[in-house]
Structure formats: structure tokens, C-alpha cells
Amino acid sequence: MARYTGPVTRKSRRLRTDLVGGDQAFEKRPYPPGQHGRARIKESEYLLQLQEKQKARFTYGVMEKQFRRYYEEAVRQPGKTGEELLKILESRLDNVIYRAGLARTRRMARQLVSHGHFNVNGVHVNVPSYRVSQYDIVDVRDKSLNTVPFQIARETAGERPIPSWLQVVGERQRVLIHQLPERAQIDVPLTEQLIVEYYSK
């Protein structure tokens, strides 16, 4: 299955949740697209579980095959499966760049990583799905510091709160990962237990 690259607002409306954060078009029309978008539909247990899984996938920009692998990895962890799944998703490098305020959206963060703008612990990384660990250090590469995306990030620093498990230091926009997040530190509007139930069938 190819990655969805169409209008995110349309997916937000279909799933009835803001997948971007601050999507004004969604706020104006928070109901599914199409001529029957406002009609009430009977929501089965399966539909609710499927929608929650799709919400998570589109929020983090992950394809189905990879998302299932994350779920299977979460099952093997000693903690609660749903919480471990969210922790895995949050530890992706593209998400860390978004959370640190270096990109306006996760989609933009994924593009910045793919274009090779970052080092992790001094090593060049251009894979958006790269997973960070506690005490990792993410740096903007020297040649990228004065490019437009990072100039904008410096100008807009502080507009969006940075989660407590991360710290952004100085004009070089160095990102320190103090820990991987606990569930209480993850603000995505998801009911992860529904995702667990979806895959448990």
C-alpha cells in the first residue's frame, strides 16, 4: 500500500479528528466529506476499532505493514501493549523533529529527515522511521542551519509547547532526548485499547 499524500483535512474529516493540529479547514467542517457526510451512521465495535487504528496511522504517517510490525513489537514488551505502541510511534525521528518544534507538521518533519538535515549522536541519519533512544542527541547539520525551514523554526520557537521528555538547546536547535515518553506525556487524542482490540481478533 502506497503512502497517502493527498489532502490531510479530508482524512481528518473522515476520521472526525484533527490529524495535523490546528487544522482550520477541519474546524470549520468537522464531519465526513461527501454529500452524506452529516448523516448519522451506526458505529459498530469493529468500525470504532478500525477508525482508531487509522487515526494513529495517519497521525504518525505510517503505512499499514509497518504499523502492524510496531504493534507486534509492542506485544512483546513487558508494559501495556497500547502504551508501548504509542511509545514506539513517538520515538520515530520524524515525530521527535515535529515535537521539538523544528517542523510545523509531521509530514514536513518526515521530509526534512529524508532530505538529510539531521545527525543523531554525530551520525548522519535520513530515515524518518529511525528510532531514538534515551540520552540521544539530535543536531541540525551545519549546512542546514541557515536554510529557510530552520530560520522559521527559530523565529517561531515557543509557539507550540515542547514535551518534557525533550529539550531544545540554543540557536543550533540541538534536541536532547531525556527519556522516552510515558502515556501521560503523549497528547494525541487516541484510545489505544481499541487498536489493541482491533489486532487481537
UniProtKB/Swiss-Prot annotation:
Molecular function terms from GO: rRNA binding; structural constituent of ribosome
Mind naming one GO cellular-component term on file for this protein? small ribosomal subunit
Pfam families found in the cross-reference section: Ribosomal_S4, S4
Question: Where's the S4 RNA-binding domain?
Answer: 91-157
Database matches in Gene3D superfamilies: Ribosomal Protein S4 Delta 41, Chain A, domain 1, RNA-binding S4 domain
Q: Which CDD domains match?
A: S4 (cd00165)
**Keywords (A to Z) from UniProt:** Ribonucleoprotein, Ribosomal protein, RNA-binding, rRNA-binding
Alphabetically, which GO biological process terms does the record hold?
ribosomal small subunit biogenesis; translation
Extra remark: Was identified as a high-confidence drug target.
Functionally, this protein is described as follows: One of the primary rRNA binding proteins, it binds directly to 16S rRNA where it nucleates assembly of the body of the 30S subunit.
The protein depicted here goes by the name: Small ribosomal subunit protein uS4
The source organism is: Mycobacterium tuberculosis (strain ATCC 25618 / H37Rv)
